Amino acid sequence: FTMIGSGKNIKSIAYVENVSEFIDHSLNFSSGLYIFNYVDKPDMNMNELVTIIKKTLKVKSIINLKIPYFLAIILGFVADFVGYIFRKNIPISSIRVKKFCADTQFDTSVNSTEFVASHSLEEAIKKTLEFEFSKQR
């Protein structure tokens, strides 16, 4: 895995089982219109997420390569240009670099509903990885 930038960018994440449980919980609300952004808290930065992923997948990399943002965005623009010239969709692009390095942190008012998620964010990430990378899939 190659980190772009410092890895301190914050990410808000929602685990699908927790979202499902919240929807079930919301069926008990009195009638009316309710609008929620659902995210599991606490938010994590990319360094924390990568640490959980490596630990769960038992990845032991000696070298943790970090590419400075300015270099990655230049490579992204080069990839954009090459993709445009050859009419090919290239896996790296300036937009993907920007999205990866951006903070995607959202507030949630779910806590005001007395809902308690049954899965912590770390547990949710581990369960997702174990499912996605299991041999029985």
Predicted regions and their residues:
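Residue-level detector of conserved, well-ordered beta-strand and adjacent loop positions
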Residues: 4-5, 39
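Short aromatic/basic micro-patch
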Residues: 10-13, 43, 105-106, 118
